């Protein structure tokens, strides 16, 4: 659900008020996490987990759209780098903090803790994550470019260039590298805990 949500919610975020969009996603994710802490049924747990994944995916889409609305082409790469780093740092911190909570209070409190932090985060997003510069009285950072009609020859050359890019081996190597990197990352995230328990005796 998270993967499908990242795909579909990107289109929705483009057409939405990202303040409300991201706040809604984070708020519902937080509430679902609180519900997960009370759940005893496996089926209900799986359903709630899927719902959580869907609404979590609204966050990345909102942030990417926000970067495009608030920063110019020259600035966007730098701020995207900060955003990407914060995502990974935040994930690492959650492992440490939630693991500490679970080891002391039990697994249910891991969801309670995440839910409470999510509620606080939703409030912060609603207060400070604004939709567009215009909504705050600032000028738009994206000046519309005058469109130029391309001739048939230019259109053909453009389409040919696109096909050439898709045929470049380096593009496919990068795409496959990214795919395998994420497979390794999520395999470690998902199964690393079980490995440490089964093979290393951690509890």
Q: Can you say where each PLM-predicted feature lies in the sequence?
A:
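Helix-breaking motifs and short loop linkers at transmembrane-helix boundaries and internal kinks
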Residues: 17, 38-43
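Helix-loop-helix hairpin linking two adjacent transmembrane segments in secondary transporters
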Residues: 83-134
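Structural signature of the two symmetry-related core transmembrane helices
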Residues: 20-34
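Juxtamembrane intracellular "pre-TM" segments in multi-pass secondary transporters
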Residues: 136-174, 199
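Short hydrophobic/alpha-helical segments at membrane-entry points of transmembrane helices
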Residues: 41-49, 173-174
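Residue-level signature of mid-helix packing/kink "hotspots" within the transmembrane helices
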Residues: 2-7, 91-92
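Cytoplasmic helix-loop-helix junction between adjacent transmembrane helices
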Residues: 48-89
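Extracytoplasmic gate region of multi-pass secondary transporters
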Residues: 168-203
């Amino acid at each position: 659900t998270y993967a499908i949500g990242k795909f579909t919610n990107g289109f929705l975020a483009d057409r939405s008020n990202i303040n409300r969009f991201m706040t809604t996603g984070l708020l519902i994710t937080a509430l679902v996490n609180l519900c997960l802490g009370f759940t005893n049924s496996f089926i209900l747990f799986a359903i709630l987990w899927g719902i959580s994944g869907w609404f979590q995916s609204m966050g990345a889409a909102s942030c990417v759209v926000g970067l495009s609305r608030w920063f110019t082409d020259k600035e966007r790469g730098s701020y995207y780098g900060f955003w990407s780093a914060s995502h990974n740092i935040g994930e690492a911190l959650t492992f440490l903090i939630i693991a500490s909570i679970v080891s002391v209070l039990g697994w249910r409190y891991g969801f309670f803790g995440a839910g409470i932090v999510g509620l606080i985060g939703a409030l912060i997003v609603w207060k400070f994550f604004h939709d567009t510069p215009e909504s705050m009285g600032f000028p738009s950072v994206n000046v519309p470019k005058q469109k130029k009609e391309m001739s048939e020859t230019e259109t053909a050359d453009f389409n040919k260039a696109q096909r050439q890019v898709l045929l470049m081996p380096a593009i496919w190597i990068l795409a496959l590298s990214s795919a395998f990197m994420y497979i390794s990352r999520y395999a470690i995230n998902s199964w690393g805990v079980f490995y440490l328990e089964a093979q290393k005796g951690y509890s």
